[in-house]
Amino acid sequence: IEAGAVNPRVLECRRLTLWRCVQVSLELGLPIGAAGQLWILPFKNSKLSRQAGTEQVDAVPVIGYKGWVSLLGRSGLTIKTRLHYEGEPWEWAEGSEQTLRHRPDDNVRLSVIQELGDQATPAAVEQIMNGLVRHAYSIATTPSGLTTFEVMSRAELDTAEAMSPGKNAPDSPWRDPLAWPRMVRKTVLTRHAKELPIAGNQAAERAVAIESHLEAGGTINDLPGLDDPEADAGQESPGDAS
């Protein structure tokens, strides 16, 4: 219900896919909705739409930035993510010893606000600031004090955005200048999560598996490990399992 209040199109999704999203929520221990931990986004199922002759919409679970922080925190990891903007001092070197130095500069944002003048709405400011992003990075610290980094360049972020399912949908968070910073922070954190020590953290391991499945072109319909109430009742509809 809360997901439908945030995005009414969710209520148009096929019930089986909504049920599978609820299962993912329960598996990961992440609430659905405005808390930003797990979102349900509607995506058109082109194959079923052609078969049915009417638009068929699937619900897809999307782990939010706050969801990843919660999942990784269960392994005792402390997580930070930041954005590096054009004009801010920056040094990043890989090798036997990683080096990351970033000095945030509030004057970058202040300059944008001054340039916009009376038109400096939050969305207008973020629209320009988003264009100035040059890197996104995450920092993870283990309970033993080991710190690791993950850095994505602007080119990598743009590629991730271009490959995101539903990126061009009217309600895609990628198209919202206020949501875009959270999306790129989530993107770099998702990539970092695949390299972090999460053995024994079943929810985090499952989250990584789900993200990898969807990134590889899989769908909620063929995601392994989910119960299918229609199949259990012997009433599975054609196409629901593929």
Cite the ranges covered by each PLM segment:
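Binding-interface segments
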Residues: I1-A199
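Glycine- and charge-rich intrinsically disordered segments
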Residues: A203-S242
